[in-house]
């Protein structure tokens, strides 16, 4: 649906932070369509700018970032960055290249993340199903990747649920 949007403003842009693009917890992670293959069909090739980084893979605040966009958007971004950035952290970029070597190296590293994280996700899902399943008071989904489980509770209950979770030592992210 996004590629088919018809925004009023010619310079309307969607900046998509695809922060969890390689954070699969299972071998059958979600497969997203390549939006950049679809955008031209609707004459919207300049509408989306996708960003991602290794910040949640290697070093928070010191990862290597990437921008995926149309040629027009890349040209505009380069022009702006040329003025804003004196120099990139080339040593940090080199460290990442030497560590990962290529995309397969990133995927192999992320399998290590999944080995650590999946049991924790499974534990949370099991507790949700055991304590709340079938009661009609909350819903959630079992994610195949990322770092979050979305929990939806009954209207008017979110604040109290957050307080109770905090007392139990569980951190919730407000949305």
Short names for language-model regions:
Residues 19-22, 55-58, 71-74, 101, ...:
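Short, solvent-exposed loop/turn segments at secondary-structure junctions
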Residues 6-7, 132, 165:
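A generic structural signal for well-ordered alpha-helical segments
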């Amino acid at each position: 649906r996004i590629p088919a949007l018809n925004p009023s403003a010619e310079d309307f842009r969607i900046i998509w932070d695809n922060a969890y693009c390689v954070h699969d917890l299972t071998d059958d992670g979600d497969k997203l369509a390549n939006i950049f293959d679809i955008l031209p069909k609707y004459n919207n090739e300049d509408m989306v700018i996708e960003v991602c980084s290794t910040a949640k893979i290697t070093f928070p605040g010191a990862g290597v970032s990437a921008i995926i966009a149309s040629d027009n958007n890349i040209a505009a971004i380069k022009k702006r960055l040329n003025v804003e950035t004196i120099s990139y952290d080339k040593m940090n970029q080199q460290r990442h290249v030497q560590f990962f070597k290529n995309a397969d190296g990133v995927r192999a590293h992320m399998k290590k993340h999944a080995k650590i994280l999946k049991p924790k996700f499974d534990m949370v899902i099991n507790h949700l199903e055991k304590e709340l399943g079938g009661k009609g008071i909350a819903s959630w989904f079992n994610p195949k990747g990322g770092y979050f489980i979305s929990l939806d509770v009954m209207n008017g209950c979110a604040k109290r649920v957050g307080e109770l979770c905090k007392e139990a030592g569980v951190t919730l992210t407000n949305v």
